[in-house]
């Protein structure tokens, strides 16, 4: 992303505190250029957080927003970042992000806050794209950007994302039989609606969790899988052919350092892997995210050895979108796919580098939202720009989730028939 022929410079950088989908404050940044181009970006926030994520700076003033305010991060943009960026080149993203990293001066963005640096980083890219009259995905990725992502749609919420008895955080459907993104989205919406009818007919709650999926009180994971298969068939589709299932276990949330405790059971790492093997035999599950806790590296190794050729094993808390960790753990044979959350690392350039390193290791990359999100659709552009092939951005409800899906529909239309939707490859390829 180096467009040297433009003469526009950054002439304004500012930030404000707005609210995310959970009613908690987050950062919105505004970057303006000398030619009148403008970039406005707001950043998300997670509930299930990896311990190695870049720091999301919060005020910790318990008298306001329960300590979740971000006025310090906003002030860092307005008083520290803005003066250094005014009159600089907005088209050299790497140089701009390197400056943000230098201004912060820490390993985890703890001085300025990753919420501050990411907002400014992506807002600058958005302003630069506007200056060149390009969509953001085209500005970031160039002419080769045309692969639409297969959506992993979260239809049942559990864990930290819902107030029900399910320990696993997300139960997702993947429209593996779709030929276009618009078809994929339609198929998912139809299954989502049929699932709602099934839950109602069983007198189960159709209230939704943080990410828009239903949050019924179900007695077991097996019950969830059976209901999902019923919903797929009720919508007129075939499990394993039209749809597969995916999980976000978020195993770190029920791991005590030695044992996994969930659903009234206690399991070792080896027993967890055996449990997943049984699930994969019984149900069309092709993707498991954070099936092992981030600190249980031996467990990750065993999971990868035993299931890595059959199932997409996604590291979220394990990698936290950190290029160094992706390189290290991929070389050690842990996982076979990386979840990409830009706010875990704090700049657009580092996000791009994380995806590049994943690709070099023959890992899939899945671009992801966070449970506390905004209506900003920039991750949709990142997914297409870098031909990631998969996106995880919630369910078929809540407008902050639908904003990403609707933006992908616009991008597919903008590609004028050149867009492709590839099948999901499993394992290192």
Curated annotation (Swiss-Prot):
Protein name (Swiss-Prot/TrEMBL)? Enolase
Task: Spell out the InterPro entries in the cross-references.
Answer: Enolase, Enolase-like_C_sf, Enolase-like_N, Enolase_C, Enolase_CS, Enolase_N
Please name the pathway: Carbohydrate degradation; glycolysis; pyruvate from D-glyceraldehyde 3-phosphate: step 4/5
Instruction: Give the UniProt entry's GO cellular component terms.
Output: cell surface; extracellular region; phosphopyruvate hydratase complex
Q: Which family does it belong to?
A: Belongs to the enolase family.
Q: Which biological processes are named by the entry's GO terms?
A: glycolytic process
Which SUPFAM superfamilies does the UniProt record give? Enolase C-terminal domain-like, Enolase N-terminal domain-like
> Its gene?
eno
User: Where does this protein come from, organism-wise?
Assistant: Anaplasma phagocytophilum (strain HZ)
Which residues are Mg(2+)-binding? 248, 289, 316
What's its job? Answer: Catalyzes the reversible conversion of 2-phosphoglycerate (2-PG) into phosphoenolpyruvate (PEP). It is essential for the degradation of carbohydrates via glycolysis.
